[in-house]
UniProtKB/Swiss-Prot annotation:
Signal peptide: none annotated. InterPro entries: Glycerophosphate_synth (IPR007554), TagF_C (IPR043148). SUPFAM superfamilies: UDP-Glycosyltransferase/glycogen phosphorylase. Transmembrane segments: none annotated. GO terms for cellular component: membrane. This is Spore coat polysaccharide biosynthesis protein SpsB. Pathway: Spore coat biogenesis; spore coat polysaccharide biosynthesis. Pfam families: Glyphos_transf. One of its GO terms (molecular function) is CDP-glycerol glycerophosphotransferase activity. The gene is spsB.
């Protein structure tokens, strides 16, 4: 474990212990904080450089004790002893990342979409507006909780984290939001008979409150895996009854962090189902939109922020490959920040290179490319599910992200080596076959479920006794 993460878990544990008795409607407010967002860039540097910033090594948390520490506190939430009901499943819209087709497969009589906005229906499912419930429900006063938080932090004025004004400001800003979310979700459970809740992440306030309220009310909660598992803070601890994952890599990772095997469900993610059943864009339209030639090979490069040197090296390595046509798909963060100069410069130098922001969807591109390049993005997985060879660049930085390491010879430290091998994959049948074998082995282990929505329905029925599938979609 890195110095930063060792410090992080010691600090997080101390925070949860300090705020354990600050509870509203039985829920500890300290568990709702998305804690890593409280850590300033300056404090992060200190945590990386000073391994014992928050205590000696003997105070560090063993990797396998991370989830048990939080699980004990989650299980200690006092239950309301409500009788189990065969009620609805609530789909929390934020971060769920379902396709429309995913929503249409749920039974409207047994399902509701919980969203920030207000509409009568979404994909034929009734919508429950968080804002409307929040406006109409009885509201708690956050003032006393803010005062208690201030008094709890008062002895820590000189503490590197708890004494940091930015840390305190973020917490004090969040506490009224915690109270509102608890009131809203509590009112939701009073309004509806709920057997299960599905969330797309446990990072945001409402998803976490939904999970903790399910624990209090005796309902089932499932958190889907929202992306490639590339960092502890966004995925652990698990707050839901069950954590759904893509495959074996994530299942083993969560178990190493102390999750119980029965807490992990290998379901894939419903949004990937469209890879197997979506009708692709017409081929002639694809080539016309990009002004590409059908006789030449196409490479997709899906970029990642803060990796300009790596992608620059790959593009430089391909600059003399006139037989290749290149699609650069920048990361959404790069598009939002307009960090695209490197890619536009590359497009000028290469006769057939296109920078695609939002003009075409990823799933319009992947059926027609011959290979894909990325680093830590789920695009690597998605391209492999589209049966394309994938080459992975190792990300820079002081953290290791081994998700794609089982690809072996098709994961690279150096961009020039990746570019060279990419050309060989497209030129040599033998090298292409090796890439295909690596792809097949990766998918067999790390995404074995081709029909994720069906797997999710099966798990929901097993856990609640209710079949939530829309009858006419069977």
């Amino acid at each position: 474990m890195s110095a930063y993460l060792s410090n992080y878990w010691v600090l997080y544990r101390k925070y949860v212990e300090l705020f354990d008795k600050l509870r509203y409607k039985g829920i500890p407010l300290g568990l709702i904080s998305n804690f890593y967002q409280y850590i300033s860039p300056e404090l992060r540097v200190m945590m990386e450089e000073e391994p014992e910033l928050f205590g000696s090594v003997d105070q560090h948390i063993d990797e396998g004790q991370i989830q048990p520490f939080f699980e004990e506190r989650i299980q200690n939430i006092v239950k309301t002893n409500d009788e189990p009901v065969k009620g609805k499943v609530i789909l929390h819209f934020d971060y769920l990342r379902f396709s429309n087709e995913n929503y249409y497969q749920f039974d409207p009589e047994k399902t509701a979409v919980l969203a920030r906005w207000s509409l009568p229906h979404y994909c034929d499912l009734p919508v429950i507006s968080k804002r409307e419930i929040a406006d109409s429900c009885q509201k708690g006063d956050s003032k006393q909780y803010l005062e208690t938080a201030c008094s709890l932090l008062a002895p820590y004025d000189d503490h590197p984290a708890f004494g940091d004004q930015a840390f305190r400001d973020r917490l004090f800003k969040d506490i009224p939001l915690f109270i509102e979310a608890i009131d809203t979700v509590d009112a939701l459970f009073e309004q509806e008979k709920i057997s299960a809740v599905i969330v797309g992440t446990a990072e945001d306030i409402y998803s976490r409150v939904l999970a903790l309220m399910c624990q209090r009310k005796g309902a089932v909660s499932i958190c889907l895996q929202h992306g490639a598992l590339m960092g502890d803070e966004a995925f652990i601890p698990v707050f839901t009854t069950y954590q759904a994952v893509f495959g074996a890599y994530e299942a083993e990772w969560f178990i190493r962090k102390g999750c119980k095997p029965e807490q992990i469900l290998v379901t894939g993610h419903p949004r990937f189902d469209q890879i197997f059943n979506r009708t692709p864009m017409d081929m002639s339209i694809f080539y016309r939109k990009l002004a590409f030639q059908p006789t030449k090979k196409i490479v997709l490069i899906a970029t990642q922020p803060f990796s300009e040197d790596f992608y620059s090296g790959v593009l430089q390595g391909l600059s003399d490959q006139k037989q290749l046509q290149i699609i650069i798909k920048p990361h959404p963060w790069e598009i939002g920040k307009n960090k695209l100069d490197l890619y536009h410069e590359a497009a000028k130098k290469h006769q057939a290179c296109r920078v695609i922001k939002k003009e075409l969807e990823l799933y319009d591109l992947l059926p027609y490319v011959d290979a894909a390049v990325t680093q830590t993005s789920t695009v690597g997985l998605e391209a492999m599910l589209f049966q394309k060879p994938v080459l992975i660049g190792k990300s820079s930085g002081n953290r290791s992200y081994p998700y794609y390491e089982s690809l072996g010879d098709f994961m690279f430290d150096q961009p020039d080596e990746l570019a060279h091998t990419l050309v060989e994959v497209l030129r040599s049948p033998d090298v292409h076959q090796k890439a295909e074998e690596a792809r097949l082995a990766f998918i067999a282990a790390n995404y074995p479920v081709a029909e994720s929505t069906n797997a999710l329905f099966a798990e929901l029925k097993a856990k609640t006794g209710v079949d939530y599938r829309r009858e006419d979609t069977e």
